[in-house]
């Protein structure tokens, strides 16, 4: 069993397993998000003005990094993973993530698409018409995960990385001797 003789040795010892645990949690969040996007966004209604691409399922990325004193992970909207459509009304990709009228004609809507869908921002016909109502998958994702799943996934991730852990509901007080 490895032994740490200083705080820095302990940090060095735990850095890799904790980073692996964070990656595990990020993968779980990514998978849960696919389910939430399906339920909240795609099953909410069927559009009449455009064909769906399903790109919002995959428009997310994860990133993890560690420093000498911290490890962290990030789950975020990544519009670069989405396709951009056409302004041609005859195209099957008409109005897919692109402005089709007025001042927004030909402008890429992907950077704002999550805000448009989740927040029901009213753009009129500029980025596809008639978003019927807010379909806030982000809030639902946070509700579904909550503190319990986050804690459970972190424990599972740390155990998968080779650490034996015991989770607590209150912070532990450590006294150095």
What are these regions (language model features)?
Residues 17, 21, 25, 29, ...:
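Conserved aromatic-histidine-acidic binding/catalytic patches
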Residues 21-44, 150:
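Non-globular disordered terminal and juxtamembrane segments underlying protein topogenesis/assembly
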Residues 2-4, 8, 46-177:
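Charged, low-complexity interaction tracts
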Residues 1-20:
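N-terminal, Lys/Arg- and Ser/Thr-rich interaction peptides
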């Amino acid at each position: 069993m490895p032994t740490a003789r200083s705080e820095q040795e302990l940090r060095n010892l735990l850095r890799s397993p904790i980073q692996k645990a964070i990656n595990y949690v990020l993968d779980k969040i990514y998978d849960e998000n696919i389910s939430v996007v399906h339920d909240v966004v795609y099953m909410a209604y069927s559009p009449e003005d455009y064909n769906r691409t399903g790109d919002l399922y995959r428009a997310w990325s994860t990133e993890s990094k560690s420093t000498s004193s911290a490890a962290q992970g990030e789950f975020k909207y990544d519009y670069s993973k989405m396709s951009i459509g056409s302004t041609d009304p005859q195209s099957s990709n008409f109005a897919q993530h692109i402005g089709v009228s007025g001042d927004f004609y030909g402008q890429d809507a992907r950077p704002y698409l999550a805000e448009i869908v989740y927040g029901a921002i009213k753009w009129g016909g500029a980025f596809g018409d008639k978003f019927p109502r807010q379909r806030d998958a982000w809030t639902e994702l946070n509700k579904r995960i909550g503190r319990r799943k986050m804690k459970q996934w972190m424990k599972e991730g740390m155990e998968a990385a080779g650490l034996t852990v015991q989770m607590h509901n209150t912070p532990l007080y450590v006294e150095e001797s």
